[in-house]
Amino acid sequence: MENRDDEVEHQHSTMGSEGGTAGDGTPPPKRKGKFSTLGKIFKPWKWRKKKSSEKFKETSEVLERKMSMRRPRQELIEQGVLKELPDNESGEAHGHKAPYVKNGHTLPVGVGGSLALEQVHSPSESEFRINPVWLPQPEDRRARAPSDGDHRGALGPRASNQDDGRRGGWSVGTEDWKNNLAWHGEDIRRGGRAHAEMDKRPGLMKAPSEDGRRTRPEPDWKPTLPRHSSVEEGRGRRESDSSQYLPNSEMMRDTLREPLPPKQSIMPPKWLMTSTPEPGSDSLPRTPVHNPAAPSFCSSNSSSSSSAGKPLRNVSSAGANTAPPGGAPLTTSSAPCSMGTIPNHPSKQPPMPPPKPINRSNNPAIMAELTQGGMNLVPAKPSPPMPPKRTTPVTKRNPEDSPLTIASLPSILSEDMRANIPGGYQLPPPPPSPPLPTHIPPSPPRAHTHHLLHQHSYPYPLPQPLPVHFDPPSPPEDPPARDEDDYSDEEEEEEDDEDDEEPPPDHLPSPQSQPELEPRSRRCLVGELSVSVIPEGNNSSEEEEDEEDQHPEESDSDGPVLYKDDESDEDEEDDSPPSALASRVKRKDTLALKLSSRPSAPDRQAPERQAKSEHSGLSWQSKEQWEAIRTQIGTALTRRLSQRPTAEELEQRNILQPKNEADRQAEVREIKRRLTRKLSQRPTVAELQARKILRFHEYVEVTSAQDYDRRADKPWTKLTPADKAAIRKELNEFKSSEMEVHEESRIYTRFHRP
């Protein structure tokens, strides 16, 4: 690792030295002056693009290749392109380095990718940065020189945090999470031997091993794994180691009162990874109690996860990152390895506190990964009661829908585990769609049991759910399939009031079916994070129609409008409505009322039959009520009719034609008379010729004429060579005999060729 980074730094320095003088043979002269940079800018002969040297290209290619080697490995593993290969090439050759492993099994992939940044810093710098943060440390831990494993374990959280933060998210495959959580739970139950290998080597100093690390070949960059011949041998060695190294719970409890730095909120603190018991503290050896049904699950898990060779993160990052500052004890226990191993001393294991809300952690994708996937969620232990905070949505419970009892738990729960679960606690059922695996997958920590249950029953993929943080101390309920951060606390209080007023519904869907969305509820199916569809149970327009039919005097339109045509629309526009949108909405409402309540179109002409047909669904108790409604409809109609323009206004606006046929005939006759008078007053052609207005005859004279060429004669264009020779001969004769020339200048007379 150091060798690789030294190469990169050396190439950076050579890039800087060679890139400056790549194009020129000689370096530019150094001029000391205030305006010396202006001479460098305004040199047009220097403005051509310089060729980049071969070394520069090779160096940049090597750098790009090395950078690209680091990044996409975890994404390729997630997509199934790469398979995880065991790194046992470098395990035996460099066994002196404390391996960054846990029980000889693998890390999740993201830590392996981020180890490339770990070894860049010097040991003094890393210890200076890490140690003052986690304040109380044991004396023997502080006295000895930090080993290489401590250095790497300390730098692991920060380096991987920076590296993953640059990539904009951390997506780890669910199989890696399963392996990590399963083996993590088993390790802590067996005595906290997360980094016992590292702490057992106090004699290895960092300074002498620097040179040895620099000369390591490339395959040894990855961390080495200790190999055991079989699973049972490794398990026995872990159990023997775990009796000596137990984390001190008092030291953990004191350190919790110190504020955690925000930079490392994703990863566990350093003392949680590499802590050793203080001398004199009581460290009881814990022997794991195995259930008879458990070893098959655990052995299948161990064999599956020991075959993969990636380095394993030692502490569950979601469980240990955020602890309440009020001195609540933090645990290192995770979920048991498929409920197989149960701690012998439950008093030594304080329960896991639920994490704080999401704004403490910098990377919500890790939290979302824990709550996603096809794993069965079975809580390990109930969390201590926290002060109630209104973050869980209120669902309407069916009185018949009793919470699940302990007897209805999955069969993988042993009797001891069932005894630990309180009576009122309700376990969420596993998701229905994915097929059951061959071995029971391990469960994540207690803090994430609030799972989106109906995730697998949707036909389209849901986005990554936001994590649900903790339950209130009341008995938990089935969470609805939605995010809980979608609305504020005030809306939840309103929803509580609505839920108290409404009676419970007649039927609730079973937890394994798709949830039914009730009317007026804020529950929604999340298709995309940017688009939330809030379905209503009934048509909202139909509900409004029913309300308006039952309370006609409260509606704004004074009952349904029975008759309305285009002219009344025009009158509404003439009356200058408050806005076009309001008039359009009003028009649509009245049209919907009319169409939904009227069975046939010919009733449009008869308002009384319309009134009967519209209110046929309602029972009239008395004739007075019927008359009142009829008069109300009549007043609405007369009001609408009184708003119409008169016939005179329509005639003035050329909309309505006059209905009198005699007037129309008289108008036509008047037009004809005017036209005939104009035509009768027109003068004849003879009068116009006599008055010299018309100067042409009414006939055409035809004469015969010969064709001729109107173009001018150009005889020089038609000369033959004989004509040209005759012209030259005549010209020469004229010059020689007839042209008067001075005798002295006759020699200069120019003659043409014959």
UniProtKB/Swiss-Prot annotation:
Comp. bias (Basic and acidic residues): 1-12, 138-153, 184-221, 229-241, 605-615
Coiled-coil boundaries: none
GO cellular component: cytoplasm; lamellipodium
Localisation: Cytoplasm; Cell projection, Lamellipodium
Region Disordered: start-end pairs: 1-38, 83-105, 120-625, 637-666
Compositional bias of kind Low complexity: 296-307, 316-333
Family matches, as Gene3D superfamilies: 6.10.140.1750, 6.10.140.2130
Keyword field: Actin-binding, Cell projection, Cytoplasm, Developmental protein, Neurogenesis, Phosphoprotein, Repeat
PTM sites of type Phosphoserine: S642
First and last residues of every RPEL repeat: 61-86, 635-660, 673-698
Molecular function in Gene Ontology: actin binding; protein phosphatase 1 binding; protein phosphatase activator activity
Listed GO biological process terms: actin cytoskeleton organization; closure of optic fissure; enteric nervous system development; negative regulation of integrin-mediated signaling pathway; neural crest cell migration; neural tube closure; positive regulation of catalytic activity; regulation of cell cycle
Biased composition (Acidic residues): 483-503, 541-557, 566-576
Record's compositionally biased regions (Pro residues): 348-357, 381-390, 427-445, 460-478
Quaternary context: Binds ppp1ca and actin.
PANTHER family associated with the record: PHOSPHATASE AND ACTIN REGULATOR 4, PHOSPHATASE AND ACTIN REGULATOR PHACTR
Membership in a protein family: Belongs to the phosphatase and actin regulator family.
The protein, known as: Phosphatase and actin regulator 4B
Gene: phactr4b
